[in-house]
């Protein structure tokens, strides 16, 4: 569509989403000189326009500077803003977080495709540039890698084009608009358009130019697009590679290609063929190493465009990963091996920069994923920056690449399904926009081996438009599967070959798997990790070994979405929805991550790392069983360490290198010896990297297994050298032993004094408690209402009975408490004291039918205020709980207040 007259009407017309924008293409690097290949994305034919731009903010279009784009308009008086970046994080507009409902709820009464006339923030951007020498006299384009939500572009006062779709590149041919010397680029960005109705993701509602902006020029003959297709044969040892090219430029040229391995050896060379607008180059590669998340083997494809005399016009490079992903016998397979997605959903997010994240952020993220045994990411819920896909190719991460599509608020209101005005649904006026978003993602990302599955988007219900998108994916790229969870609610428009659900209970998944399923199952979202959470995850990972058709899931989600905010006293804090007086909002529902927004690792990650281990270690009294559940990697990449501890103190350790083939198991005897100590003996086995990798240093632990191989001897079974003195009073019973004294009260219902080395430790009698601070997920399921009588039980429990038993080497005291629950119940507390001052405490609650679930069962010990640190022998090092302790290790740990 060639149009030179912009119109604000486009903002409310879903059928106009691109004006003068060029077609999407592969994210390929290209150069005029072979020696420039090493520059990678800093290629000389590219000119970065990031930096400080002139900027003017308006709350709506009627207040904007209407003629700011004109060549003669003086912008020297307006403010500056940093590009890339969100305007809301640079002093303009307001930060707003919201989940499903649309952000204008309660402010404007709207229905698709309309937007507010009074509040639709406008950012008017201007920058000046001179075209660098390498780009002069060439066809030149401008690329906007990400602009939210809709924008108009002018160069030197001339209208260039218009585009929507926040998360894929928008590019325009500006060759005819450029001039010698200084050029003026003007961009007018609108926070809302008709596209806002289908960009209702669970995130902060930002706007502005938040990804890179750059110019690029192409040689006289240029490889405009590449689509790599591979066909593996001879038991996956060899491959035929077809490079389908779209060319622009001079027909008096030839094109050829060759493939290099990581050592720089040419392993396949094509014939030279003459120029054509569309052509295919053929290679046959022998003895290849396949790509997987475990072994991300990459090759480099070089495409050479030469003049007839042999002089180079252009060299194009493309990283290649050979892999074979398919549905085989109702199982998703990589190289015919069942794949399990140990995944997370990941928003692009930074506490300082929002979704305008940096390369450093991405490197931190991908190293964290690899270090925590996470092998897959769903790009929730939009295509990520192109660099992320290159990193996933290089480091080894499987991707579900998700289209920028979510219309949650149009069909689900207050948790109820009500799709009467759902978009895009089956509305023909939205279909082209939906398909354009799919095409923009596929065309850019189609050559990345990390992408295994195309996703039609998220939580947009169902209909003909999304169904047509799924048909497009399958026709365009049969080598990948198609995902869309939303059809679970409307199976008439089934789009996928696997079952995908959100937040199903493990028992519900098991019911599906036991009912002769026709499709394999994945959880595209599970383990809602909001706040203190991620308990019970083992109930899901246990299904991996039990059912072949259970193929894993994607935790919701990777990182908290919180923003730094400065308080009146100057202190910075991480702020959530509502903290910016944003209304409507969903408050702290943006905090669902395994990491905090500042990239501090949360205790939840400890559990995930363990349950996502690809190698299981099961130690016993003599050695360890190693179950290698990798698909392709032998355990000889790791060293096996063993550590024997006596009540947490090291008595023996060592290591060896062992070889266990993929998908096999082996028992390894360890030289750990026999130990006749009264203390508890624990064997910990650990697999650690034998060599450094891109993502961790040598010696980094990737898996562990632990077992108590000898229980602590009971105090009844060995003689105590310390004799106790029992003092019976009318109210108290005193127990005196070696360097300790304890007083148990018949009146108070427990210990009233506990002294070691004549030092008092406690302030009040310890009491049982049955209530804890509610977590975010508790509040989400109304736990505080359902279980509130346990709070009353904690506060109102009544001491009702006491008894005591004396033995030669110990004394046992029994206290019974009655709880004010309905029905009523009793709890018995037992103290067993030895002469050494060891006190074993047992709390016994048998359970009563008719009561709600017990939030917690514990004892509250109030210590003197002077104590500010403690050590313990128990599970650690991170916080753990009865349903989140698989990844914790038994040992001695220290902490402070």
UniProtKB/Swiss-Prot annotation:
N-terminal signal peptide: none
Catalytic activity of the protein: Hydrolysis of terminal non-reducing beta-D-galactose residues in beta-D-galactosides
Keyword annotations: Glycosidase, Hydrolase
GO biological process, one term: lactose catabolic process
Species annotation: Clostridium acetobutylicum
Similarity field: Belongs to the glycosyl hydrolase 2 family.
GO molecular function: beta-galactosidase activity; carbohydrate binding
GO CC, alphabetical: beta-galactosidase complex
Protein name: Beta-galactosidase
Domain of life: Bacteria
Induction: Late in the ABE (acetone, butanol, and ethanol) fermentation and subject to glucose repression.
Membrane-spanning ranges: none
Annotated Pfam families: Bgal_small_N, Glyco_hydro_2, Glyco_hydro_2_C, Glyco_hydro_2_N, LacZ_4
């Amino acid at each position: 569509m060639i149009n030179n007259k912009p119109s604000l009407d486009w903002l409310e017309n879903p059928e106009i989403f691109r004006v003068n924008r060029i077609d999407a293409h592969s994210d390929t690097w290209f150069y005029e000189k072979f020696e420039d290949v090493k520059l990678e994305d800093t290629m000389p034919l590219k000119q970065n326009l990031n930096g400080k731009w002139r900027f003017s903010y308006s709350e709506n279009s009627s207040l904007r500077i209407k003629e700011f784009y004109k060549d003669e308009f003086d912008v020297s008086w307006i403010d500056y803003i940093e590009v890339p970046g969100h305007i809301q994080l640079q002093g303009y507009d307001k930060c707003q977080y919201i989940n499903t409902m649309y952000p204008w709820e309660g402010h404007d009464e709207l229905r698709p495709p309309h937007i507010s006339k009074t509040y639709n923030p406008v950012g008017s951007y201007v920058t000046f540039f001179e075209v660098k020498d390498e780009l002069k006299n060439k066809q030149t384009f401008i690329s906007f890698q990400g602009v939210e939500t809709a924008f108009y572009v002018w160069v030197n006062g001339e209208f260039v084009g218009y585009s929507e779709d926040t998360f894929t590149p928008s590019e325009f041919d500006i060759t005819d608009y450029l001039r010698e010397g200084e050029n003026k680029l003007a961009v007018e960005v609108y926070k809302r358009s008709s596209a806002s109705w289908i960009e209702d993701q669970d995130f902060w509602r930002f706007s502005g130019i938040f990804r890179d902006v750059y110019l690029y020029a192409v040689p006289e003959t240029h490889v405009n697009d590449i689509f790599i297709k591979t066909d593996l044969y001879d038991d996956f040892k060899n491959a035929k590679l077809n490079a389908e090219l779209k060319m622009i430029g001079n027909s008096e040229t030839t094109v050829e290609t060759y493939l290099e391995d990581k050592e720089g050896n040419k392993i396949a060379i094509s014939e030279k063929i003459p120029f054509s607008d569309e052509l295919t180059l053929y290679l046959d590669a022998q003895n290849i190493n396949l790509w997987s998340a475990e072994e991300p083997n990459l090759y480099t494809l070089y495409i050479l465009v030469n003049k007839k005399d042999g002089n180079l016009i252009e060299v194009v490079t493309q990283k290649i990963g050979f892999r074979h992903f398919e549905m085989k016998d109702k199982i998703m397979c990589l190289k015919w091996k069942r794949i399990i997605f140990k995944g997370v959903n990941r928003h692009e997010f930074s506490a300082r920069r929002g979704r305008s994240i940096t390369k450093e952020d991405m490197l931190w993220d991908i190293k964290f994923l690899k270090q925590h045994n996470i092998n897959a990411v769903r790009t929730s819920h939009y295509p990520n920056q192109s660099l992320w896909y290159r990193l996933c190719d290089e480091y080894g991460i499987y991707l579900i690449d998700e289209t920028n599509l979510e219309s949650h608020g149009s069909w689900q209101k207050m948790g109820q399904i009500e799709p009467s005005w759902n978009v895009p649904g089956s509305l023909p006026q939205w279909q082209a926009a939906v398909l354009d978003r799919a095409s923009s993602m596929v065309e850019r990302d189609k050559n990345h081996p990390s992408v295994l599955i195309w996703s039609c988007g998220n939580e947009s219900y169902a209909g003909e438009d999304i169904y047509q998108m799924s048909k497009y994916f399958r026709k365009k790229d049969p080598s990948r599967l198609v995902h869309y969870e939303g059809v679970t609610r409307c199976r008439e428009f089934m789009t996928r070959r696997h079952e995908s659900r959100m937040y199903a209970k493990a028992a519900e998944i098991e019911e599906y798997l036991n009912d002769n399923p026709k499709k394999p199952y994945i959880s595209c979202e599970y383990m809602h990790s909001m706040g203190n959470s991620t308990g019970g995850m083992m109930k899901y990972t246990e299904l991996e070994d039990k059912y072949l058709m259970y193929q894993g899931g994607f935790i919701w989600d990777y990182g908290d979405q919180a923003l730094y905010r400065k308080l009146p006293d100057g202190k910075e804090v991480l702020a959530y929805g509502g903290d910016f007086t944003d209304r409507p909002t969903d408050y702290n529902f943006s905090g669902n991550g395994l990491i905090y927004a500042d990239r501090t690792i949360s205790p939840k990650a400890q559990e995930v790392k363990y349950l996502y281990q690809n190698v299981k270690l099961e130690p016993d009294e003599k050695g360890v069983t190693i179950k290698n559940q990798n698909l392709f990697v032998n355990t000889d990449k790791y060293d096996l360490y063993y550590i024997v501890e006596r009540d947490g103190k090291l008595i023996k350790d060592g290591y060896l290198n062992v070889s266990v083939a993929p998908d096999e198991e082996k028992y390894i005897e360890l030289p750990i010896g026999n130990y006749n100590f009264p203390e508890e003996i624990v064997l910990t086995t650990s697999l650690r990297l034998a060599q450094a990798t891109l993502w961790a240093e040598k010696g980094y632990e990737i898996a562990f297994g632990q077992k108590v191989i000898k229980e602590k001897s009971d105090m009844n079974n060995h003689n105590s050298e310390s004799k106790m003195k029992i003092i019976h009073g009318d109210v108290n019973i005193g127990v005196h032993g070696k360097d300790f004294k304890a007083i148990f009260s018949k009146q108070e219902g427990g210990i009233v004094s506990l002294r070691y080395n004549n030092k008092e430790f406690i302030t009040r009698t310890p009491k049982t408690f049955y209530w804890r601070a509610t977590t975010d997920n508790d509040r989400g399921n109304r736990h505080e209402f359902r279980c509130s009588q346990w709070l009353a039980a904690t506060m109102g429990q009544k001491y009702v009975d006491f008894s005591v038993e004396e033995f030669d080497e110990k004394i046992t005291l029994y206290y019974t408490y009655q709880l004010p629950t309905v029905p009523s119940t009793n709890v018995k507390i037992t103290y067993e004291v030895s002469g050494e001052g060891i006190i074993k405490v047992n709390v016994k609650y048998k359970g009563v039918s008719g009561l709600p679930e017990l939030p917690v069962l514990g004892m509250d010990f109030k210590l003197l205020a002077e104590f500010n640190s403690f050590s313990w022998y128990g599970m650690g090092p991170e916080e753990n709980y009865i349903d989140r302790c698989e990844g914790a290790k038994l040992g001695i740990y220290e902490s402070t207040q």
